[in-house]
Amino acid sequence: LKTILEYLDTPPYLRKKVYPKMWILKHAGVLPPIKSPHHKALINSKDIKDIEIRFGFVVKQNDSLYVDVGLQKLIRYNGTQLGKKVLVKISNKGKLLAQDISKEEIDGYWGYEVQLSDSLSALLENRNCEILMTSVEGSPFTKHVEDLMRSLKMSKNLLVVFGGPKFGLRKILESENERITQKPHFLNMFPKQGTQTVRLEEAILGTLSIVNNYLNA
C-alpha cells in the first residue's frame, strides 16, 4: 500500500523512471489520477521565463548531474542526489539550472508523504498537534466544531485518524492495550449517515473537505 500511495503521488512523467516494473503496481494504471498541483503537464523548456518548481529524477550524463523534470530535455542540476526523486526550483538566467528546494518553501499544497507506524498508539503518542479521531461512535462533529477550530488555530497542525475496513479506532486501541496521554477529538463526521459504515476513501475525502471548509470560513 505504501508503494502504491507513493506511486500515485509521483508526477506521471516520472513514474517509469522512479518505479521499474513491479508486480505490486501491475494494475496501478486503472487507479484514478489525483491531479495534485505538483502533477504538472509536459512543457517546452523555452516556456520557463523565470522560476518553475517541479519534481524530477536525477541522472548522470558526461560526468555531470542533470534532472528530468518533464521537459523535452534534461536540466543541469546543482545538487548531489543521484538516482533519486527530488523537488527542485528551476531558474532561468540565460541557462536553466535546477537546485533542491523543500516543500516548506512552497506556498500551498505540494503532495503528501507516506510513513509507516508500528501501531496506532505509537502513531498518536507525543504528537505536537491536535488529533481528530473519526468514528461512528464519536460525538457529532457539528456539536464540537467551535472547540476543534479554536484548538486548531492555536496548534496550527492537525492529525486526522481513520479506522480500517474491519475495525474501528476504539477496537484497535483496545487490542493494543495501550493508553494515549494526549486527549483527542473523538468525533462522528457523518452523523445520521444512514449506513452502518462509510467507505474509507469516502470518509477521507468527506472529512478533509468538511475540515477545510470550516478552516477557510
Q: What residue ranges belong to the model's regions?
A:
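Post-transcriptional modification and biogenesis factors for structured RNAs
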Residues: 1-217
